[in-house]
Amino acid sequence: MTESTFPQYPRLVLSKGREKSLLRRHPWVFSGAVSRLEGKANLGETIDIVDHQGKWLARGAWSPASQIRARVWTFDKAESIDIAFFTHRLRQAQQWRDWLAKKDGLDSYRLIAGESDGLPGVTIDRFGHFLVLQLLSAGAEYQRAALISALQTCDPDCAIYDRSDVAVRKKEGMALTQGPVTGELPPALLPIEEHGMKLLVDIQGGHKTGYYLDQRDSRLATRRYVENQRVLNCFSYTGGFAVSALMGGCRQVVSVDTSQDALDIARQNVELNQLDLSKAEFVRDDVFKLLRAYREHGEKFDVIIMDPPKFVENKSQLMGACRGYKDINMLAIQLLNPGGILLTFSCSGLMTSDLFQKIIADAAIDAGRDVQFIEQFRQAADHPVIATYPEGLYLKGFACRVM
C-alpha cells in the first residue's frame, strides 16, 4: 500500500516533550501526555499518534474514557491495522509457542500475551484445540472481527470461545461478553497435559480463561522441595500445585480455597492422575482465617505454597495490598517447621520484585524468623515480556528457606 492510498486516521497530538516514552517504544499513551485529538475517532478506533510538531510516532487505538488514552498497535508507519496485520502478529507469536510446545511437550499455552506480543488488550490461551479469547481494551474490542478472521486463517481447525467477561471492560463502557465464537462448545471440563500431569480445565466457568498457565514452571519447580514433606497449598484453585506436590512424593498436601467447585475439580485432578487420594485433603475456608486458626492450634508444615489472587488493581490500593501480602506471608512463616520452604507469589503487576522481596523480609522480621531467598520465579516462557514494556512482568515469586 502506498502512502497516497493509505487510510487517513485521526491524529492524536501529544503535548511538547511528552513523546519520550513512545520514542522508547513503550506501547501506552497516558491522558496527561495528550494535547488534542484532530478529527473524530470512535471508541477503540485506530488513530495516528504525533508529537507537538506533527511528526509521526505510532499508530494505536483510541480510548477516550481510560487513563491510557491510546494503546499502540505499531511503530511502523507502513502498517495498516487490518486482517493482514493481525494475521502477521499471530504467526509471529505462534512461532515461539510452537518451539516451546515441542520442547516442553505442551498441548496448552498462552498464544497472545497482550502488549508483549504486539496486540495490546488481547489475551488468547490455547487449550488443546480450543482458543480462548479475552478482549480487555476498547481497541481490542473494536478489532474483534478482524482478529477472529485472522485466528481462523492461522488456526482453522481450532474452536474459538470468548471469555471477555472481565470487569475491566466496564471502565471503558464495554459490555461483558462470553460464549462460543466458532466451532464446538468446550466440554464442562477439558483435560490438558502439563509436565506429566493431566489437569481438568473449566473454560466456560473457570477463573480468567479457565486455568493459570503462567504458573506452569513454578508448579514443576515445587516437586524438588516436597519429598516426604507435609505441604499446605493456599489459594489452591483446581489443585495444579497439589497434583505436582503429590507427583513429587509429598507425605500430605492440604489444599485450601473458598470455592467448593474448584476444590471438587482439584479432587478429580488427583484421581485423574491416579495419585493417592488419602494424602490429599481439601479444605473450603478463608485462607487468612484458617492460617490464624492453624497457628492457634499449633499446626506445622514443611512446605507452604502461597499463590493468592491479585491484591492490587491500581496505585491507590498498593499500600493496602502490601499489608495484605505481609500479613499472609508472616502467618505462613510462623507455621513452617525450621528449615521449611515457603513458595510465595504475587500476580499484581504494580508489585515489583524488589518490593515483594522487601515485604517477605518484613514479614519474616514480624514472625521472628530468619529467611533465606533460594530461588526466584516468574511467569512461564509462553508469557514473554517485551523489553520496552516492563509492566508485562506481572507474576513474581520466591522460594524461601525459613530458619
UniProtKB/Swiss-Prot annotation:
Q: Which InterPro entries match?
A: PUA, PUA-like_sf, PUA_sf, RLMI, RlmI-like_PUA, SAM-dep_methyl-trfase, SAM-dependent_MTases_sf
Q: What class of enzyme is it?
A: transferase
Q: Which residues form the PUA domain?
A: 9-86
SMART domains referenced in this protein's UniProt entry, alphabetically: PUA
The catalytic activity, as recorded, is: cytidine(1962) in 23S rRNA + S-adenosyl-L-methionine = 5-methylcytidine(1962) in 23S rRNA + S-adenosyl-L-homocysteine + H(+)
SUPFAM superfamilies documented for this protein: PUA domain-like, S-adenosyl-L-methionine-dependent methyltransferases
Query: Under the GO molecular function aspect, what terms does this record hold?
Result: RNA binding; rRNA (cytosine) methyltransferase activity
Q: Check the record and name the Pfam families matching this protein.
A: Methyltrans_SAM, PUA_3
* Cellular localization per UniProt: Cytoplasm
Keyword annotations for this protein, in alphabetical order, are: Cytoplasm, Methyltransferase, RNA-binding, rRNA processing, S-adenosyl-L-methionine, Transferase
The EC number of this protein is: 2.1.1.191
One GO cellular component term = cytoplasm
Give start-end of the signal peptide: none
Chief localisation class? cytoplasm
> What protein family does this chain belong to?
Belongs to the methyltransferase superfamily. RlmI family.
Q: What does this protein do?
A: Specifically methylates the cytosine at position 1962 (m5C1962) of 23S rRNA.
Report what the protein is called: Ribosomal RNA large subunit methyltransferase I
